[in-house]
Structure formats: C-alpha cells, structure tokens
C-alpha cells in the first residue's frame, strides 16, 4: 500500500526531491516559472518523466533535425506513433523501431517481450494492421554465463510475445561484442499495412469530446520506466526491477482487433498508445498536438492494485493500454465494441479549450499543468562535443593486412564467429510463417512479406555494423544506411524509407556526443543520396555499465517495395552452370572486420570507406537487372568478406557449390570488408544482357560438386571447402556455445 504521505511542494524544493526524479536544479526552476508556483508531488512527477531524454529527446533534438524526413511517398514523418509511406494503390506501409535496452538488461524476458508489445501498439495506433516484426540485438561474448542467460531470455521473450499475438517475426540481426556485456541492446521493429483513408492520428480535437481509457488495467509496474531509461545502468539497477513492465500478448491481440474495428467508426477522433510515461505522455501529447487541453478523473482509471495515488496512475507503464478521444455522445458504442472483445473501455475525461492538463482525484484537483509545457517545452540542450581521443590515433595508423596461414581454416573459423554464424537457433523459436504472407523467411539478405490482394511485396531489414561506427562514426553511419538498402535491393525491393534506433552511451560525455553527431551526419548524407527519408525512430542514451559505453549503434530499419513478387530474389545459388559475378572492387580494408577481431581480439584503425555515388549507381544497376529477370541469386558482401558471402550462397542451396577465381592479394580478396559489393549469379543465356546492364566481373560458376573452390589469379587453389562441412560448422556454432 502506498499510503505514505507525499512530500509537500516546499519539501520537494528544499530537500531537492525533484533531483531523485531526474530533474536538474535549472529544470525545476523552469517548472516553477511555467506554473508561477511550486509544483506538487504529482506535477513534479509529470515534468520529470515528460522532460526525460527518453520522452523529450532534449539532448538529441538538435542532432535529429539533421535527418531528411520528407519525400514524395512520405505520408507521415516523425512525431506520431509511427511513420507512413505510400506504396501505391491507395495503400501505405507503417513502420517504426524502438529500443527496450535498459529493461532487457535487468529482466530480459519481460524487457524484450514488452519491447515487442510496445512497438506493435505504435503501429496499430496509426490504424494499421501489423504484418511483420523484426529485431536487432546486441550482446557481449557468448562465453560469459551472464550473456548466455540474457541472450536466451531475450530471444524467448521476443518469441513468446510475437508468437502468441500471431504476427510473424521475419528478420533481424544479432551481433556479439565485449562492449555489450553489461548493457545488451534490444531494438524491436514492427511493420504494418493500411489504406490511406484509415490513417489515424494521436490528437485530441473538439472541445467537449470524451477521453476514454481502453485495454488492460493499471498497476504499479513500470513507474518511472522512461526516467530509468535515461540514466546509466549500475549495480543498483537490479533494485529497479519494478520498473520493468509485464506483457500479456493475448490481451494485446484482442486490443489490436478491437482498435482496428474502432478505427472504422466515425466516432473515433484520436488514438494513442500509452507507452513510455503511460497516461502522462498520451494525454499531454494528444492535447498538445491538437492545441487543446484535457481534464481527467483518475478515480475512473481501471486499477489492478489498491490505493494507487495520482502520481502512480499517471506514471505507470502497465502494458496493453490505449487512450482514445471519441465524439461526445458516442461513448456507449465504444464500450459495447470493447466489451465484445472482453476489454474495458471507460470514460475518464474530456477535451477542453484552454490547453491545460487537469487531473482530479477524490473530488480534488491534483494537478494543473499546461499540456504544451509537458509535451513541447522541455529544455533543449546543445551538449558539448569533442572528437574522441582514439579517433585521430586510428586514422593515422598504417593498416597492414592480417597474417593468415591457412585460408580454409580461417574461413571455417569465421563461419563459426557468432556474429556471422547461422542465427537459426534464434529464428527457429519465432513463428515466421503465421498469417502465411511471408515470401522470404529469415536467413536471406532481407525478409519479404506479401501485400495481400496484390502482386506486391514489402522487403524489410535491420542493419548496423557498430564496429565501423566506433572506428569512424560518420563513415560508419553512411555504411549502416547503405548496407540496409543493399539488402533490400538484393531481395528485389526498391528502398523506400528508414526508421532508426540510435543507441549510444552517456550524451553528457563530449566524446559520446561527438559519436552521435557524426553518425547522424553520415546517416543523413546516405539517406539523402539513396532517397530513403527517416520517418521516425527512437533514441536510447546512457547505454553504459560501470562507465564503459557500448559501441555507437544507430540501428537502421529499412522497408522497400517489391513491385512484383516475381522479382523476389534470395541469396542462395539456384542451379549448376550459372555464372558467378562480383560487383564492386575489393581493397585491403580490415578495420573493424570480423577477421581483425578474430585474430587480435579487438578492433582498430580505419573503417572501410564508402562512396555513396558508386553505391547508388550499383544498387540501381542490380535492381534493374533483377526486375529485368536477369538475376538468379543476389547477396550483399558484408562481415567476413567475399569468401563468407560465396560460402553462404552455397550453404543456402542444396548440393551446389562454386568454383571461382579472385584476383589480388589473397587475404584481402577472401576476407576484406570493402563496401558496395555484391555476389550475383546469372543464367548462362543471360550473360550478354547482364554484362550490358551491370558493371560486374565474372569470377566463376556454380557447380554441382557440393564444394566451394577459390583460386588466385595464377590459378593456384587458395581453398577448397565441402559445403556440408561448412553448413555444419556455420549452423552449429551458436548452439555449441550455448551448451
């Protein structure tokens, strides 16, 4: 029972209780000035959570403004629950990615599960039906028992929620590096489909209209979750387990169906998910976006615990709840609709004209705050930025090609590195076929989901090589966007737009803020060049444990349009006799590479370089060749270089191999991680047409020998590897480490 007496306004100021809630002295003075008086305990809570980095982006807004956010297909950019992009035929794709890093570090199963639940709500709150889930995960090295536990529980949490709710988890990525040991990253992405006329906004228009609460009841879980996400993890974080919410996927499944039915009613004015900061953010944001106010009667909030205070109800982050505004007089229709699904829908307030958020409890007004002050007027900080000390040192290093004695052994060792190895152990736990629209299942460059009732598909991927970004944030930022687009193109899709999840350390450290600025500069430049605007996303700061930050990890979630499903292309070889081509030049670039990490146990030097003009030209050529029906298989060359890419294309096929000849110094030819490269196979009869359309070098052919043989330019064999043995090593690596 929380019947402890709340501190009064004078105590809050004199004892600096606001500081424990996350407000600085200057911020508290601003609140005092806005209100013209000292705030009470509930009001202090409202400001502390709405002005947290997690809700207000107060440290990152100046940087986020650099992103291009408009384009001819963009129907909704950043600022709503999720972004929306037109895909023709009166249809649109809705998508967004968010982090649930801090909760997952402490309570990995529920942290990951509720991350999935929250991102699904962001998508269906726009009026869209969720059709696919993806995720991007980062962990420490699997040798550590703690990391094994986090990895197994996070994957189980994602699977548990996604499988129950009946939305396929179709793709994602998992990378392992020591810097994530104490602070894993769990980024979840949801993609939905909508007809243009069904698009809804989270806005509270129309004075006198009714504010209703729908979905699950409110408990004490997740109070101050947004504030918890805006500080560094420490040993005492374990004590904050109550801040991790518990998800109920069956409740959410009912909520989706009820909300999608609700959206068809003209009674609905606005709808928003109660996510971070729960009732506070949904009410303040909906009022502020509409230029209105809201009055709420907290006695009417469905509560699953006794004696909850206004402070607790407003800050709870209990899951599976939405706030809606409906036309006055239509409330009973809404109640009946939700009752049909066994869900609560209660009237708890109304829209007002005076732009104030007013809260009443037990007949008394317990808070009166301008909605704009909470939602829009958080202070914005231009943090000091300073080039990281390591950067100049890395830039000046003379890069030497790593010494490799045995190419075959090295290839096998690379295939067994957890970052490269098969993620089948992960995605086998996910139901990626539910709804039966999945055209390309996990394991290829991008997943493809059918757009029902059409011949179109949506290609989708998450990408980010954090090592490159650590070595050179600006170049690494460009590479993250370019690689995502390359994966979409290899699957037969035209890249449309991105959502981003910016995972960084403590922005109050100038070297971290420099990483944020530079990587956003690089991403923005690539988004402009590749014409993939940023339509929404999420910032996750303070990803540190004991003062050590994670690698800068601005994850890119990209969606592309496959204009005709017959263009869908996958990475595995298709038939013996096809010609193997490599597009793009290989340089001796090993900085941040899988080979460098494997041989030295650390990364250093310069990241691979990228020329965005060249990248765009190659992507356009490859996509045109795929659409012309000239391409059998396509695979982006990424971690592990050409040897790994060719091996993966053979591993995915049945009984096929390849014989190829690679020019240049052998270690670089096999394992360097130069950008803007593709491995493509083409039917022999399409050789001339393909070579006319694409600048590519034929390096060999697909065989039915079940072996990959790679020669150097003198025709000497560098390595011969049996595909079954490679597959066994590649598939067995992660299960073996988990034993």
Swiss-Prot record:
Substrate binds at residues 99-102, 121, 245, 317-319, 540. GO terms for molecular function: ATP binding; magnesium ion binding; phosphoribosylformylglycinamidine synthase activity. Its main location: cytoplasm. It is found in: Cytoplasm. Signal peptide: none annotated. It catalyses: N(2)-formyl-N(1)-(5-phospho-beta-D-ribosyl)glycinamide + L-glutamine + ATP + H2O = 2-formamido-N(1)-(5-O-phospho-beta-D-ribosyl)acetamidine + L-glutamate + ADP + phosphate + H(+). GO terms for cellular component: cytoplasm. Mg(2+) 1 binds at residues 98, 538. It comes from the Bacteria. Keywords: ATP-binding, Cytoplasm, Ligase, Magnesium, Metal-binding, Nucleotide-binding, Purine biosynthesis. ATP binds at residues 57, 96, 500, 537. Its EC number is 6.3.5.3. It is an enzyme of class 6 (ligase). NCBIfam families: FGAM_synth_II (TIGR01736), PRK01213.1 (NF002290). Part of the phosphoribosylformylglycinamidine synthase complex involved in the purines biosynthetic pathway. Catalyzes the ATP-dependent conversion of formylglycinamide ribonucleotide (FGAR) and glutamine to yield formylglycinamidine ribonucleotide (FGAM) and glutamate. The FGAM synthase complex is composed of three subunits. PurQ produces an ammonia molecule by converting glutamine to glutamate. PurL transfers the ammonia molecule to FGAR to form FGAM in an ATP-dependent manner. Monomer. Part of the FGAM synthase complex composed of 1 PurL, 1 PurQ and 2 PurS subunits. This is Phosphoribosylformylglycinamidine synthase subunit PurL. The gene is purL.
């Amino acid at each position: 029972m929380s019947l402890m007496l709340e501190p009064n306004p004078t105590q809050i100021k004199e004892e600096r209780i606001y500081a424990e809630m996350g407000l600085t002295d200057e911020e508290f003075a601003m609140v005092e000035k806005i209100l013209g008086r000292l705030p009470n305990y509930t009001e202090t809570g409202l400001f502390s959570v709405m002005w947290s980095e997690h809700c207000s982006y107060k440290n990152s807004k100046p940087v986020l403004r650099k992103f291009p956010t408009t384009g001819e297909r963009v129907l909704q950019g950043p600022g709503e629950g999720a972004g929306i992009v037109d895909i023709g035929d009166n249809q649109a794709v809705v998508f967004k990615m968010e982090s649930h890093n801090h909760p997952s570090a402490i309570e990995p199963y529920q942290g990951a599960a509720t991350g999935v639940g929250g991102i699904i709500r962001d998508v269906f709150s726009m009026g869209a039906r969720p059709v696919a889930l993806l995720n991007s995960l980062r962990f420490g090295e699997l040798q550590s028992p703690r990391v094994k536990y986090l990895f197994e529980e996070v994957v189980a949490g994602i699977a548990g929620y996604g499988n129950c709710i009946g939305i396929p988890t179709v793709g994602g990525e998992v990378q392992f590096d020591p810097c994530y040991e104490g602070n894993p990253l769990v980024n979840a992405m949801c993609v939905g489909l909508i007809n243009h006329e069904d698009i809804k906004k989270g806005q509270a228009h129309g004075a006198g209209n009714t504010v209703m609460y729908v979905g699950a009841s409110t408990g004490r879980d997740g109070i101050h979750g947004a504030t918890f996400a805006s500080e560094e993890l420490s040993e005492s974080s374990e004590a904050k387990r109550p801040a991790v919410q518990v998800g109920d996927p069956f409740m959410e499944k009912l909520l989706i169906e009820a909300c999608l039915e609700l959206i068809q009613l003209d009674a609905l004015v606005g709808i928003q998910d109660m996510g971070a900061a729960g009732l506070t953010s949904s009410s303040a944001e909906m009022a502020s976006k509409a230029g209105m106010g809201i009055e709420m009667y907290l006695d009417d909030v469905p509560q699953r615990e006794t004696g909850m205070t206004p402070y607790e109800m407003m800050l709870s982050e209990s899951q599976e709840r939405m706030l809606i505004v409906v036309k006055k007089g239509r409330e009973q229709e809404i109640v009946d609709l939700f009752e049909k699904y066994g869900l609560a829908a209660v009237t708890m307030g109304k829209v007002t004209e005076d732009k104030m958020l007013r809260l009443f409890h037990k007949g008394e007004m317990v808070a009166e705050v301008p909605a704009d002050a909470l939602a829009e007027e958080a202070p914005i900080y231009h943090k000091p930025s300073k080039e990281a000390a390591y950067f100049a040192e890395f830039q000046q290093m003379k890069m030497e090609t790593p010494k490799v004695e045995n190419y075959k052994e090295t290839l096998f060792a690379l295939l067994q590195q957890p970052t490269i190895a098969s993620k089948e152990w992960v995605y086998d736990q996910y139901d990626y076929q539910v709804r039966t629209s999945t055209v390309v299942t996990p394991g290829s460059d991008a997943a493809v989901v059918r757009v029902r009732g059409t011949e179109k598909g949506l290609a989708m991927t998450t990408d980010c090589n954090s090592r490159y970004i650590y070595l050179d944030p600006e170049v690494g930022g460009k590479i993250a966007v370019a690689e995502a687009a390359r994966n979409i193109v290899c699957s037969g899709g035209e890249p449309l737009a991105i959502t981003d999840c910016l995972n960084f350390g403590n922005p109050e450290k100038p070297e971290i803020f420099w990483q944020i600025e530079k990587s956003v500069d690089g991403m923005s430049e690539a988004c402009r060049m590749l014409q993939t605007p940023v339509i929404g996303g999420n910032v996750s700061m303070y990803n540190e444990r004991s003062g050590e930050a994670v690698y800068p990890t601005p994850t890119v979630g990209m969606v592309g349009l496959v204009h005709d499903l017959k263009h869908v292309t996958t990475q595995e070889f298709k038939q013996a006799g096809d010609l193997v081509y490599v597009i793009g030049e290989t340089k001796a670039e090993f900085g941040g590479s899988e080979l460098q990490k494997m041989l030295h146990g650390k990364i250093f030097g310069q990241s691979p370089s990228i020329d965005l003009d060249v990248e765009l030209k190659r992507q356009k050529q490859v996509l045109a060749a795929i659409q012309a029906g000239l391409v059998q298989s396509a695979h982006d060359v990424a971690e592990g270089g050409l040897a790994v890419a060719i091996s993966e294309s053979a591993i995915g096929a049945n009984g096929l191999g390849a014989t190829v000849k690679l020019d240049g110094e052998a270690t670089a030819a096999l394992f360097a991680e130069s950008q803007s490269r593709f491995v493509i196979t083409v039917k022999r009869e399409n050789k001339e047409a393909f070579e006319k359309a694409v600048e590519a070098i034929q390096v060999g052919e697909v065989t039915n020998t079940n072996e990959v043989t790679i020669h150097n330019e003198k025709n000497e064999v560098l390595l011969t590897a049996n595909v079954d043995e490679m597959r066994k090593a590649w598939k067995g690596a992660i299960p073996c480490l988990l034993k």
